[in-house]
Amino acid sequence: GKWDEGGLTTDDMVTISECAGVLQYAQTVFEGMKAYTTEDGHIVTFRPDLNGERMEHSAARLEMPVFPKDRFVDAVVQTIKANAAYVPPYGSGATLYVRPYMFGSDAVIGVKPASEYQFRVFTTPVGPYFKGGAKPITIRVSDFDRAAPNGTGHIKAGLNYAMSLHAIVDAHKNGFDENMYLDSKTRTKVEETGGANFLFVTKDGKVVTPKSDSILPSI
């Protein structure tokens, strides 16, 4: 098979079989980025080519067809252009969130890859990620594992986020903003938080980043 030409639509509804691979076996990957208005009025986004590369790796891991990086970037750019009126103004702290995603769309009964897929991009205006401004948050070392050794922690798959829901709800119930996850094999090494990579700065100003095959590479 091959990808069709695609196109722009204002319809935000997706109609698929109730047996679709995405519904029955969580066969979906996604990316996330933002479009900003600069001080001089230009609309920009940061390195969508890297998001395209990451989605290629994610798709391959879940036995999904690779959506070419150049087409990924073009789809993102065209979608942002079509929604330029919804990009918040410079200085507002708000942005246009851009969500490219891919999923198995045809009926699948039996654990196997789907044979048909959809790649889509939608956008929505969002406020500042840190509602009260950039300030320290409370983090706990979680008793839960985010990813298994040799598992899917290094890709941006929907199933990883479903697995983290209980942990973040539990953290909030206990008065914490976020979880810090340790490596699940030895539980002695810091990996990442639920929503971001983790960076350490030593006393002499050196930046240290965790290295693990179960951490989602940042962009």
What are these regions (language model features)?
Residues A82, G104-S105:
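Intrinsically disordered, low-complexity linker/loop segments enriched in Gly/Pro
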Residues P88-R99, F103:
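Extended, Lys/Arg-enriched charged tracts that mediate electrostatic binding to polyanionic substrates
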Residues G1-T79, V108-I219:
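Helix-start/capping segments and mature chain N-termini
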Residues A85-G91, V111-P113:
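Short, charge-rich binding segments
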